[in-house]
Amino acid sequence: MILGIGTDLCDIRRIENSLERFGERFTHRVFTDGEREKCDRRAARGPSYARRFAAKEACAKALGTGMSQGVFWRDMEVINAASGQPTLRLTGGAREHLARMVPPGHEARLHVTLTDEPPLAQAFVIIEAVPVAGAS
């Protein structure tokens, strides 16, 4: 069953301006160490950061919290599965809120898609609850 859907459209130029103007103050406030490491290895950092920013916004919308109710930027980390497919790792308030959303006998699955076509980056997040095998 679908528990939440979120989407966000982010102007890459806005993220590039924040990177230029605020530098590490911006990246350390919004992104995890792993996200910063991955983005900073890219020649075009702006689109990479913008996709992740959009994913965090979309996830907060799917959670139904926005950036409130104890959910913070760094509670949501864009990671890649072994296949390269993007997904999200939730910690802190985001993880706690997700746990409250999931009905007994189910587990959460997060589906993420990211894209960019300058000057825009976009993300969709779907939170799904699937039955746990053997749960009654």
UniProtKB/Swiss-Prot annotation:
Broad class of enzyme this protein falls into: transferase
Coiled-coil residues: none
Keyword Lipid biosynthesis set for record: yes
GO BP of this protein: fatty acid biosynthetic process
GO molecular function: holo-[acyl-carrier-protein] synthase activity; magnesium ion binding
Transmembrane segments: none
Residue positions binding Mg(2+): 8, 57
Catalytic activity: apo-[ACP] + CoA = holo-[ACP] + adenosine 3',5'-bisphosphate + H(+)
Keywords: Cytoplasm, Fatty acid biosynthesis, Fatty acid metabolism, Lipid biosynthesis, Lipid metabolism, Magnesium, Metal-binding, Transferase
Annotated Gene Ontology cellular component terms: cytoplasm
Job description of the protein: Transfers the 4'-phosphopantetheine moiety from coenzyme A to a Ser of acyl-carrier-protein.
Protein name: Holo-[acyl-carrier-protein] synthase
